[in-house]
């Protein structure tokens, strides 16, 4: 029977057992493998740039080999676990090791060998970070590229039943998606191919344990204004206990995040603070387990942590994460969340947060996904116990992936006295209604998406209007080109300005080959709080010779009530050797009054392992009022971090 027909009809794969990886690779010459099916932008069971997959296993690992035919490979992301990989060429392998059809380990990689891993629940309603023991070996060939994925059984939890497997391949230049099994949703776990293994042949080692002490030593030189240089010697330490990939305990004292890259500045016309993402490792690992539908704790508000404890454990159904942090400003902050995953795409969460002497909160949240209609039903109820203030949030969302109708409807109610320093909620005593609608369709190879949104925020007790926003738009794409046109209308009474209206039209153009090979240009014009606004944004990302990545952003602003005239930024990832990377950043801001500011930042990192490395970072702020530049602040940090797994001494 033809293997492609076999998998489409029976949805079963019975892979061959091999002695080791080498014997699996030798068998590729005689085993025909499985072909992926093109499902977007049009369907084709034999696409010209085809993909052949081989699957096998040994006593300690699962093997997946992919042969990818392609002219003009596009990949530039080199940072592990970066979502930028989604704009590159990539392969994504789902493995449902419990056979329940509601959760899967995910292994994603691009032709550069950059890896991303996560745990996906049915329909993509929840994505959990996960760092497992797996590797991928990629190689460019005359016909495209090859990849070997090896997943060690000891790094995953599994049941001795039929597993599930889905394999996806994305080709960036044509936005082409290929699947092993055609399903209504590319994020669907239920209905993927059955993977039948003989568990009598699998040797399962005892759970792997790690006990890793990590010591950090750093020397800092700091200079502010016209004062003298100040030198500091600082230290920090972390003790980490890890059981497999599911349980982790971290104890940290005087953590340092000087090697964390800076934020790329964004301009927010709504006059609210930008919610920049968390980047500090202590708060990132396990963050997905404490995430709620409305962000009740923003970890970036914990700016100066002195010590911290973190614990999380992931079970088949029950998971828990807890953080307890001592901060220089907020004193003691603690937050935790437990989640229970039911069989039928239903997740229930219980959350708690407290800050010393000022804040105590309990909440419950739920997410129900209905795959037949691609619908999420999301809800949250919480109560600030010290202020007896409630929050209620309900959202109904229908997902639209490639074509068809998508929409969301939501309602948010917050009582008075709910605002706290540890979250990012700017308004209390409010009720907010939001709605969005979009419809996507294809004309030949042209993708067209028409959309609109509306939201209104009112005082919960007086019904006074606080803000109202709406805007239609349309986007058209023919890979690698795209074009969008739309408008944004808003009445933002919370600004307190005499004329609080914002009426802006925009048009944008983009050309994108991969995450670091793209350019976009947008034009915005209209009325902005009673003044004329003209705003041009240019974005350019380059990957010269596929050796390093460099990005440029330029924002030109012409508006009487905005102080900035232009903001120019440079950032990048520049490998100096195999393990040494330089990450530069420059922000040059010009003001209308003739005042200029420059912020320089750079990190040179030598990463020996995830727990050991050497780092050199610098920061320098300059200003010019007239013709002379003055240094306002500068800092240089040299840091050594060393960690070792003590369990290696036992083995």
Where are these regions (language model features)?
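Sec-dependent N-terminal signal peptides
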Residues: 2-10
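Short secondary-structure boundary/capping segments
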Residues: 266-270, 364, 393-394, 424-426
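A generic structural motif
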Residues: 59, 88, 244-246, 343, ...
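Exposed, low-structure sequence patches enriched in small/polar residues
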Residues: 304-306, 312, 372-651
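Outer-membrane beta-barrel transmembrane domain signature of Gram-negative proteins
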Residues: 187-206, 328-362, 485-541
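Surface-exposed extracellular loop regions of Gram-negative outer-membrane beta-barrel proteins
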Residues: 204-250, 333-383, 443-451, 510-512, ...
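Structural preference for beta-rich elements and adjacent junctions enriched in aromatics
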Residues: 10-335, 339-340, 349, 631
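Short, solvent-exposed loop/turn segments at the edges of secondary structure
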Residues: 86-88, 102, 359-361, 389-391
């Amino acid at each position: 029977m033809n293997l492609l027909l076999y998998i489409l009809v029976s949805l079963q794969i019975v892979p061959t057992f091999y002695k080791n990886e080498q014997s699996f690779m030798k068998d590729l010459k005689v085993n025909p493998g499985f072909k992926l099916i093109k499902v977007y932008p049009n369907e084709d069971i034999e696409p010209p740039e085809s993909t052949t997959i081989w699957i096998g296993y040994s006593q300690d690992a699962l093997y997946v080999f992919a042969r990818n035919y392609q002219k003009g490979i596009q990949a530039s992301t080199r940072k592990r676990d970066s979502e930028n990989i989604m704009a590159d060429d990539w392969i994504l392998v789902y493995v449902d090791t419990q056979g329940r059809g509601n959760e899967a380990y995910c292994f994603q990689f691009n032709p550069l060998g950059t890896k991303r891993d996560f745990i996906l629940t049915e329909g993509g309603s929840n994505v959990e970070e996960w760092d497992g023991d797996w590797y991928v070996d990629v190689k460019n060939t005359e016909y495209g590229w090859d990849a070997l994925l090896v997943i060690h059984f000891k790094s995953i939890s599994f049941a001795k039943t039929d597993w599930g497997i889905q394999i996806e391949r994305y080709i960036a230049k044509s936005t082409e998606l290929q699947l092993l099994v055609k399903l209504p949703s590319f994020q669907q776990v239920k209905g993927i191919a059955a993977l039948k293994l003989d568990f009598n042949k699998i040797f399962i080692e005892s759970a792997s344990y790690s006990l890793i002490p990590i010591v950090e030593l750093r020397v800092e030189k700091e200079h502010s204004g016209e004062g003298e240089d100040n030198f500091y010697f600082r230290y920090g330490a972390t003790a980490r206990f890890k059981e497999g990939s599911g349980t982790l305990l971290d104890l940290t004292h005087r953590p340092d995040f000087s090697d964390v890259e800076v934020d790329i500045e964004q301009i927010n016309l709504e006059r609210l603070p930008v919610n920049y993402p968390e980047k500090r490792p202590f708060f990132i690992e396990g963050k997905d387990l404490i995430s709620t539908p409305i962000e009740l704790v923003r970890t970036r508000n914990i700016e100066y942590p002195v010590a911290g404890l973190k614990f999380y454990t992931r079970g088949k159904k029950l998971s828990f994460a807890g953080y307890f942090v001592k901060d220089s400003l907020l004193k003691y902050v603690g937050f935790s969340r437990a989640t229970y995953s039911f069989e039928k795409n239903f997740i229930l969460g219980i959350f708690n947060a407290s800050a010393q002497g000022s804040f105590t909160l309990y909440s419950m949240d739920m997410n129900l996904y209905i795959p037949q209609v691609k619908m999420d039903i999301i809800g949250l109820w919480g109560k600030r116990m010290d202020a007896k203030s409630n929050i209620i949030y309900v959202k109904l969302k229908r997902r639209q992936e490639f074509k068809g109708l998508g929409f969301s409807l939501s309602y948010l109610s917050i009582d008075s006295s709910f605002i706290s320093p540890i979250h990012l909620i700017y308004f209390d005593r409010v009720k907010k209604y939001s709605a969005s609608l979009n419809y996507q369709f294809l004309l030949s190879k042209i993708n067209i998406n028409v959309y609109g949104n509306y939201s209104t925020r009112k005082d919960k007790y007086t019904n006074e209007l606080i803000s109202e926003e709406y805007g239609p738009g349309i986007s058209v794409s023919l890979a690698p080109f795209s074009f969008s046109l739309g408008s944004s209308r808003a009445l933002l009474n919370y600004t307190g300005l005499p004329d609080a209206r914002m009426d802006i039209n925009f048009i944008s153009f983009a050309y994108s080959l991969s995450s670091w090979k793209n350019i976009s240009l947008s034009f915005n014009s209209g009325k902005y709080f009673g003044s004329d606004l003209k705003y041009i944004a240019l974005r350019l990302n380059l990957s010269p010779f596929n050796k390093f990545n460099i990005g440029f952003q330029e924002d030109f602003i012409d508006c009487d009530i905005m102080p900035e005239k232009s903001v120019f930024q440079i950032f990048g990832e520049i490998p100096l050797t195999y393990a040494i990377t330089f990450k530069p950043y420059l922000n040059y801001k010009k003001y209308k009054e003739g005042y200029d500011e420059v912020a320089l930042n750079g990190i040179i990192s030598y990463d020996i392992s995830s727990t050991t490395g050497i780092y050199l970072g610098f920061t320098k702020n300059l200003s010019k009022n007239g013709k002379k530049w003055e240094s306002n602040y500068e800092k240089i940090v040299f840091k050594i971090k060393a960690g070792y797994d003590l369990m290696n001494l036992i083995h």
